[in-house]
Amino acid sequence: MGSFKDTFVVGAKGEADAMSIAAKAAELKAPIIVNGWNDLSADAIKLMDGKEIGIVGGSNNVSSQIENQLADIDKDRKVQRVEGETRHDTNAKVIETYYGKLDKLYIAKDGYGNNGMLVDALAAGPLAAGKGPILLAKTDITDSQKNALSKKLNLGAEVTQIGNGVELTVIQKIAKILGW
C-alpha cells in the first residue's frame, strides 16, 4: 500500500463521512478504514499501528469502544474525532478541521436518503486531492456548512460542481459567501 503516516476511520454506515474526508485522505495518501460496529479487524489494527488516526463521524457510526482500541495503537496515543449532529455538520467540521484557507471547493450530492447518490463525491475525491474539500449538499447548505465556508473560502475561490443533483440554491448561497 505504500508509505503513509495518517489513517482515517469511518463507520460501516458512514458513507457520507468517508466522502467528506476523501479529498484529504487522497492528498495525504491515507487509507480510509471502514470499521465494523464492535471491533476492528486484526488487519486494520496492524495497518494503523503507530499511525496518526482520525475518526470521522459520531459514536453512532464509530463506537467509543473502537475509539478506545484506536487510542491504544495511535502514534501519540490520542485519536481525534471529527463529528457533527448530521452528515452535513460532520462535513462542515471536516472542512474546519483539516483545511486552511481555500481557493477551490468541490460540491457533490450529499446522498441523504440514498447513499448510492454519493457516487459523484466518490469520483471527486482524487480530483479534489490537494486542492480543496468536497462539500456535500443537495437542496441547501446548513448553517454549520455556511459558517465553515465563510471562515475558509477565499474571495474569488473556484467552485466546481461534480455531477448533477445539486440545486441552484446551493450554488447561489456559496456565491453569496464569495461576494459574487
Region roles according to the model:
Residues 1-180:
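Extracellular glycan-binding segments that recognize GlcNAc-based cell-wall polysaccharides
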